[in-house]
């Protein structure tokens, strides 16, 4: 009886050692694009138009809105899906509501080259930037709407300025490095 239990215990131990155990401590930065606004005084939605048609889980829209969107997001999804960019950039089904006090961030697999497209629900109009690039892991762009009339409808051109916080990003990098190192040392 004891012999069977010892053999069973050894078999379980052997199986446990044979199966790999993975430890993940990836706290590093992820490529992202943040869109900040200034002078925006009405409801607005934003997306990034990408050169590619697929980036990771992001792809071209189908005939119907995907299930992960909330019903109140449907008008914005339809407006972005209907927009035809003259330079061939594509809507990849990422969108967010944006305001001066709450920037929008595409934080997972953001495109490398893109345009920022805004949609104004009240007028149905758009505002679009020139082609931009993700110049850093946490690229930040600020768009000033002081000279833009969202009620005008149609497509207006806006300018996006880089607004990168070098000090804050350096501090964040140091903190992530320390946390990753601490977790790796605890696991090892």
Residues of each region from the PLM?
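Core alpha-helical transmembrane segments of integral membrane proteins
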Residues: 168-188
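Bacterial N-terminal signal peptides
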Residues: 10-20
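Short acidic/polar inter-strand loop motif in beta-rich domains
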Residues: 120-128
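A short, amphipathic beta-strand motif
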Residues: 29-38
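Sec-dependent signal peptide cleavage junction
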Residues: 19-29
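Short, aromatic-rich amphipathic segments at membrane interfaces
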Residues: 130-172
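Tryptophan-paired
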Residues: 60-108
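A short, solvent-exposed beta-strand micro-motif common in secreted/extracellular proteins
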Residues: 112-120
